[in-house]
Amino acid sequence: GTEADVLYYFWVKQAQCPECANYVDLFSTRIFAKHAYPKRHPTARALCPGCGEVNETRYDEKQLRCTSCDLEFDPQTGPANGQKACCPSCEHVFPIAKTIRERGKPPNHRLYAKLMLLADGKKAYARTTEADRAKFEEAVRLLADRDSPYPVVAIEPGYNTNQALGYNYRYWHEMFNERQLLSLSILADRIRQISDPVLRDLFTCLFSGALEFNNLFTSYKGEGTGAVRHMFAHHILKPERVPLEANVWGTQKSSGSFMTMFEGRIRRALDYADNPFELRR
């Protein structure tokens, strides 16, 4: 197969049905990717509820036939509807937040799609494969082998944290998946090794920005704008039902990555310090 950089992985939260114990994907719509200005750029991507294939469609399409399994479905709907969800297996309707809270631990997530940057510079959406899942499991193992890779700090109750606590997020590191924790811990280690204290502080500030865009509370804004909606976009820590996993280090076409923030924040700030435009004559 062709090798490509993955810009973003797409995940969905799951709740366990209280009636039949099957895990329910908390999609409110099967359309998971569309342009930031869909009326001008109507092409979107929808996930087949039958086989999991990624289908190209319009953002407002209401009847779609899967190109892989021929299943007809309405891409505008999903198991989740407001604060409740309907189990596709047994049709039991249950409250989402209460069901997750009673489980006593943060909800499960399922990896279902990815956006790749191909060698020719084009982007392509695709369903995830066993190889993708194996790579994630490898990250889980590598994280387990690291010595104290992240701080364990409790989340205190408050206006901005109560929603997260309601979903059983008790510690800050639980807001990240294992691959994010692995990547961020490696990056933090390298920053700590910088001998110049000024440069070390500079990159520590940049690392703080990377945390905002690389966690399970981010979501996909779509193409045509900065693709990653960071964790503080809602001014509270809102658990995202369809979180986005970005490429922590990044590529030239990434959003919210360490590399692109270096170019967009640090390099621009240094250029401005050398040549502040208000003082030009």
Task: Locate each region found by the language model.
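Nucleic-acid modification enzymes, centered on SAM-dependent nucleic-acid methyltransferases
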Residues: 1-281
